A protein has these predicted regions:
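Conserved acyl-donor/pantetheine-binding loop and adjacent beta-alpha core of acyl/acetyltransferases
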Residues: 73-106, 157-158
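Conserved acetyl-CoA-binding loop-helix of GNAT-fold acetyltransferases
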Residues: 103-120, 137-142
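Conserved catalytic-core motifs of GNAT/GCN5-like acyltransferases
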Residues: 128, 146-162
Length: 170
């Protein structure tokens, strides 16, 4: 598969759970191998969170020619995680947030597809990543996201953890 393949975004269903878990497992391993073992630890996102996200209708999959190759959480803000920032957002207009995005690694363009999907509903998208996730930082900056500062999340495996906060405004 290549970047020319058509990607379809759709809400995840219970039938997609095993594939989503597999993609997240592979993403954790990729991050670990690339110097970022802390962002998701060894088990995050937890299965019960994924099940809940599917039930709520905020987990999406990226389908490429009938195969799920990406997964992400998307919802409209405000997001409690983004209420306090060491820095400044580009604006305070309504936005969508993307969390827990992961790719199978078999296709390129999963992040682009998710962002394009979000931009169908808003002019502002916010996302964050770990300071050691150099791959994601490069992808976000290539798409046009601006690094706005630092936010903090609580991760059970590392406590209060800084994240690089990004904002795309169209």
């Amino acid at each position: 598969m290549n970047t020319g393949d058509i990607m379809i975004i759709k809400k995840a269903t219970a039938a997609d759970l095993d594939r989503c878990l597999e993609i997240y497992k592979n993403a954790r391993e990729y991050m670990r191998q690339n110097g970022n073992p802390d962002q998701w630890g060894t088990e995050y996102p937890y299965e019960h969170l994924i099940v809940e996200d599917i039930a709520i209708g905020r987990l999406y999959v990226v389908d490429c020619d009938g195969s799920i190759e990406g997964v992400f959480l998307m919802e409209s803000g405000p997001d409690d995680t983004y209420l306090e920032i060491e820095g400044e957002w580009l604006n305070e207009e309504p936005y969508y947030v993307i969390h827990r995005i992961a790719s199978s690694g078999k296709v390129k363009g999963v992040v682009n597809a998710a962002v394009d999907f979000a931009l169908q509903n808003t002019k502002n998208v916010r996302i964050d990543t770990h300071e050691k996730n150099l791959t994601m930082q490069k992808v976000l900056e290539k798409i046009g996201f601006k690094h706005c500062g630092t936010i903090y999340v609580f991760a059970p495996w590392e406590g209060r953890s800084p994240r690089m906060a990004y904002h795309l405004a169209k």
